[in-house]
Amino acid sequence: MSDSRFSTSWALVLPALLVTAICFAVPVANVLRLSFVEPAAGFGNYVELVTEPLYRSIAATTLRMAVATTAISVLLGYLVAYVIAHTAPRHRQWLLLAVLMPFWLSVLVRAFAWVVLLQREGLINAALISLGLVDQPLALLRNETGVLIGMVHYMVPYAVLPLLSTMLGIDPRLVPAARACGAGPVRSFLKIFLPLSLPGIVAATILVFILSLGFLVTPALLGGGKVVMVAQYIEFGISETLNWGIATALATCLLALVVVSLALVARLVPADKLFGAK
């Protein structure tokens, strides 16, 4: 009986494994191969990545933007998820719909929308000047500020989903019980709700960080060529300079960083707790 179940399980899993191998493993292996053989066999591309100031600067910019985006997105996502989790169920679906609506727009459309809003004559600068908060338009485009705004706007929904899933799995009787025992609202939150929502924070952090590493369109449009991230340079190396060796080496390093991040999270937080599973 157990052998038949084992055979059935493999029969169901095998097609997925084959598709994964063909569509993911083979291309990744080819990228890894190219990073060692283009333009000449050896570790020359990786040595150049370490020694060339340009590539170190691009890597530093990518990490800096990814970390900043992750921190702000998780903070905002936590606030949004907290409000949704403590809203009556009949209204919760509408708030969740509002969070999911940005997924219906492409990243290109959203980036162009921010270009319109953040330009010197845009709505945001006009509002700041009319309110008397600034005397002249702020430079919100072609710098890291504009790129950060666009990236955070794109990433907040990704942070909300795992956080909300975890919060909805927390027993709603715990905080009122703590309040009944004399704990204040802040103490109840810090001692009970926040620790129980930690798996969601970890899941949201790693999800947003990994996705932020691969941004291409948003920094290209909002950065105006002055904020270059790894994904942009990979695209530039493949389509413009035809420097496949450096491009594939950068892609390999980016993939390695993602794998290491996932491995650390898997070691710190059990998989069944990452998304609020009971």
At which residue positions do the language-model features occur?
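The alpha-helix within a helix-turn-helix
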Residues: 178
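Membrane-water interface segments at the C-terminal ends of transmembrane alpha-helices
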Residues: 7-39, 53-168, 192-216, 221-223, ...
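Short cytosolic juxtamembrane segments of multi-pass membrane proteins
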Residues: 268-278
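A short amphipathic helical element positioned immediately N-terminal to and/or at the very start
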Residues: 41-50
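Short glycine/proline-centered loop/turn elements that form peptide/ligand docking sites
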Residues: 170-174, 273-274
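Glycine/proline-centered hinge or cleavage motifs at structural transition points of membrane proteins
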Residues: 181-183, 195
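Glycine-rich helix-loop "coupling/hinge" segments at transmembrane-helix boundaries
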Residues: 38-40, 216-244, 278
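Short, Lys/Arg-rich, polar N-terminal cytosolic tail immediately upstream
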Residues: 1-6
